Regions:
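Conserved short submotifs of the Hanks-type protein kinase catalytic core
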Residues: 97-111, 115
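AlphaC helix of the eukaryotic protein kinase fold
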Residues: 57-81
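Protein kinase catalytic-loop region centered on the HRD/HxD motif
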Residues: 140-158
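Activation-segment/catalytic-loop signature of the eukaryotic protein kinase fold
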Residues: 93
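C-terminal lobe helix-coil module of Hanks-type protein kinase domains
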Residues: 166-169, 202-352, 422
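Conserved N-lobe ATP-binding subsite of Hanks-type protein kinase domains
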Residues: 39
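Conserved N-lobe loop of protein kinases adjacent to the ATP-binding glycine-rich P-loop
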Residues: 44-52
Length: 425
């Protein structure tokens, strides 16, 4: 049943999976996240639609700025051009009842900030192969955007400028997706006016802190920060004041991840150091080069992306079960007929047959071959085929915390992620 409750005092009724609220061509099914710039809602289309959306609605106070509205729409349209398996797809930018919104694919999962927080709470780390794979896919998505061209083949020179854990989504199907790519440039020009940049300094590059011209290499540095933090479960840059934090970023004095995690190899230390080089000339010159080195390292681990799916479902076991239940209510579908990859335009809801017994893999089975990013010489980057979730999930293996012989060299820092991100789940 669809609720007819109107919005009051500029606020939207968030709705619920079993109590949808109309919003233009969509029905809102509950609030996903709220920030200083926008609110994000789970939504579906008209009755009978078999697809979920994430609808980002601009806060009313920002809509008073005409130039911001214009940029919001222009950058949203740019995001619609970013069709890559490692970037959340944007379907449309629109307006309804004086509210401006962006409709994106819905990804059932958690952002990387939440993953790091849960790892800290459970005294474990993201396994090294998983962290390497996630960083490689982040770099792949960045490279695709960096090399996007217009219809005449002219480079668009896109730079994200806001690559951070909160903008990386990990799905329960093991997908890695960059969020908010197309509107990053618009938001960064206005967020300082409403205090949103506070806390973002720790994911900026040295040249960004200095106010210098930026290119793709600034996103490489930010991706390096994320890699370092996944390997160590520690914030790389922090300070008691904003000025102190900015000085830390400007100097870019980076300890090797192996100082915190003995499972990090010298080769991985070297990759992190090159991505985090203070001077851009010493850094990876493209996100593709970073992705290539990370993918080469993954081959040595014989990592299967399905392991990330298992890790996410185990780490967020209760949340995953709730996701299945809410999705069934949202789409008026039986829970057993659902997969988490429900937002793909070509397929819609994936109906899963009865589970089959798991098939054991031979011990020497090689890892799945990973597509490389589009080359910079192509006029228009082409997205590699997306990773699809298998109908019958493999048995979840219990993730083990780091071995006791790997002591934390800085125990006083262990509570950082939990204390920083104490938010409502």
């Amino acid at each position: 049943m669809v609720s007819e409750r109107p919005s009051q005092e500029g606020k939207l009724s968030p709705g619920a999976p079993n109590d949808p609220v109309p919003f233009g061509k969509y029905y809102l099914l509950g609030l996903i996240a709220r920030g200083g710039m926008a609110e994000v809602y789970r939504a579906r289309g008209q009755v009978g639609a078999k697809r979920l959306y994430a609808v980002k609605v601009m806060r009313p106070q920002l809509a008073r700025e005409a130039r911001f509205i214009d940029m919001f729409h222009r950058e949203g349209k740019l995001a619609m051009m970013l069709r890559n398996r490692c970037i959340v797809e944007t379907f449309e930018v629109g307006q309804t009842d004086a509210r401006h919104y962006i409709a994106m694919e819905y990804i059932g999962g958690r952002d990387l900030t939440q993953v790091l927080r849960r790892c800290q709470e459970t005294q474990q780390r993201i396994p090294v192969p998983h962290a390497v794979y996630i960083a490689a896919r982040i770099a792949e998505g960045l490279h695709f955007a960096h090399n996007l061209t217009d219809t005449d083949g002219r480079p668009l020179n896109i730079v994200n400028r806001d690559v951070s854990p909160s903008n990386v989504r990990l799905s329960y199907d093991g997908e890695v997706k960059l969020l908010d790519f197309g509107i990053a440039q618009a938001l960064m020009k206005f967020t300082s006016e409403i205090g949103i940049l506070k806390g973002k300094f720790s994911y900026m590059s040295p040249e960004q802190i200095r106010g210098m011209p930026l290119d793709a290499r600034t996103d490489v540095f930010s991706a390096g920060i994320i890699l370092h933090e996944m390997l160590t479960t520690e914030k790389l840059f922090r300070g008691d004041t904003e000025f102190a934090l900015m000085e830390k970023v400007r100097k870019a004095e980076v300890p090797p991840p192996s100082n915190y995690n003995r499972r990090v190899t010298p080769e991985l230390d070297a990759i992190a150091a090159k991505a985090l080089a203070r001077d851009v000339v010493d850094r990876y010159q493209s996100a593709a080069a970073l992705a290539a080195d990370l993918d080469a390292l993954i081959a040595g681990y014989r990592f299967d992306p399905k392991e990330l799916r298992q890790f996410m479902r185990q780490l967020f076991r209760k949340e995953y079960a709730k996701e299945i239940e809410d999705t069934a209510l949202s789409l008026e579908t039986e829970p057993g007929a659902l997969s988490m990859s429900m937002s793909t335009p070509q397929q819609g809801v994936v109906r899963v047959p009865p589970p089959a017994p798991p098939v054991a893999q031979p011990a020497g089975t090689p890892a799945e071959s990973l597509p490389r990013s589009a080359s910079a010489s192509q006029a228009m980057p082409v997205a590699p085929p997306p990773i699809r979730a298998t109908p019958s999930p493999a048995p979840v293996q219990q993730q083990q915390p780091p071995p006791p012989e790997d002591p934390d060299p800085s125990p006083e820092k262990r509570g950082f992620w939990g204390s920083l991100f104490k938010k409502k789940r």
